[in-house]
Amino acid sequence: MFSLQKKALQHIYMTPENASQLTKDLLQHLGLYWNGPIIKMDTVVHLHNKIFSNRSVLKYALAKQANITIIKTLVLWVEPEYALAQALKHNRKDVLECIFSYHLTTPKYHHIMHLTSSQELFEFFHLFICKSKNYNARMECLLYAATLYNFPNILEKNREYIIRYSIGNSLFAIACKERHIHLIAWFVTAGVLDTYDDSMLFNTAFKLGDYSLLEVACDLPIIYPDYLIISMMQTAIQKNYFRFFKKLLTHFNIYRQIIITDAAYYNRRKILLLLLKQNIFNNFAILCALSAAIKGHASKKTLNLLISQLDSQMTVVDSVYYSIIKYNNIDCIPLLMQIKTFRMETLVSIAVHGNNINIIAACKAFLPKDTLYHLVLKMAIVSRNYKLFKLYTEKENPMYIFTTIKAIISNLVNYTVVQAVAIEYLRKFHQERQLPIVPLLMVLAEHNYITKFKKTCYAANMSDQKVKRALIKCLFIASQKNYCQIFKYCFGSLLKVLSKHERVKFFNSVVFAKKLASYYDHQNMIHLIDSLIERFRYLIKD
């Protein structure tokens, strides 16, 4: 007669014909519902060809809540960690006690604590695996584990302890890192954080790129200051987190110029579209955004988007011009030409002042040659930038440059200091290129630069007929504009070089000059001419 033990062993190989996997029948044949002893085996053979590991048998036995006596035997057939993990999964405190009784010196198994869903079992398990004898150390270990594996009830239960020992912030950091949304909300609202910063949750959300964490921060019953939300919006723009930005914008409804400016600078077209659809920003704000887009070398699509939102009559602010020049953004110039109030002249003037050769060269495609040279040379003179002046004059036709500078000098009548600089540049250019003296004499006489006029006359060939005719013309200019010194010098110079026959014509010219002075009512000039005629009349007598 077989003993029960032998009978059980025999039944290991006696399984139902239709059994294809580990079933209740097999467990019964194995004796898992029998209170007697079971002999340890490495594997269990089913249907003579299917082999089940001891782990599979233990896992199934726990799932079917098999006899504890049998399970106590089976846990010895597997590794302690696997047995503990299965006991936690199935919330079997009795099995845990059994395992811990077998393994009094267990290593740390914190990494499998999360396998249980039972708060009681979690705490019980931690009690065994935490080796510290210090109560505070064990409590902190438990709370850190509860935070790590998302057990809010344990934290709520020990709320006073968290406050007393000021460990709320470190636990909160773990919750944020692990993205336990409900736990994060609990930390913020439970009053356990000793130094809570409003930006902490937002910063963590951006750092982790966690949208759900941002939603928690937005939905918390906290009134955030505007500057914080604006700062977070700027961060969203920099990181190009469109969902984050949209959530902040729609939830807090905060609009500031710095926001659209940053979006333009970082070329965030999608964010710009969202902002511009609100119809909140005025033309000035959009112009500032355009300036920022130029600064950041934004795409053509972004620039066109901003330009299309502008009022066509809106005056372009200086910051737009300065941004083009400072950041050398040539590509945006054709796009800005769409704005009616955009002035190439202003751009060139500022470019010359900033000595930006690239921008000046780029403007050649959009301005007539005369206009460009007039602007460049004028600004070079005004800013006393002789290097730029020389750059734009050395390869050009000398007389063309002379004529251009002459026109510039005429435009600077009310700016005597700058006009004097222009005259000096003209004389220097005239000398370097060895141009005819006559045009220079006329310019100096017309603007009453007597000292430079005298020096030029001194250097001229006074016997040259062209020079003589030029001096006579200077007489007329002087009488017309009441330049007594110029008139007197021309008169004296001509008397020295004219023949007797020429003097007669010359005196006729002087009489005509007197008529001009009378027409303009220049009494000083009239008296001067009368005195000169009376004094030198003898020169035309036979």
UniProtKB/Swiss-Prot annotation:
Keyword Mitochondrion found: no
Keyword Lyase set for record: no
Q: What turns on this gene?
A: Expressed in the early phase of the viral replicative cycle.
Enumerate the UniProt keywords alphabetically. Answer: Early protein
Please provide an example of a Pfam family that matches this protein in its UniProt record: DUF249
Task: Please state which protein family the record places this protein in.
Answer: Belongs to the asfivirus MGF 505 family.
| Record's function text | Plays a role in virus cell tropism, and may be required for efficient virus replication in macrophages.
Q: What's the protein called, per UniProt? A: Protein MGF 505-11L
Q: What organism, scientifically named, is this protein from? A: African swine fever virus (isolate Warthog/Namibia/Wart80/1980) (ASFV)
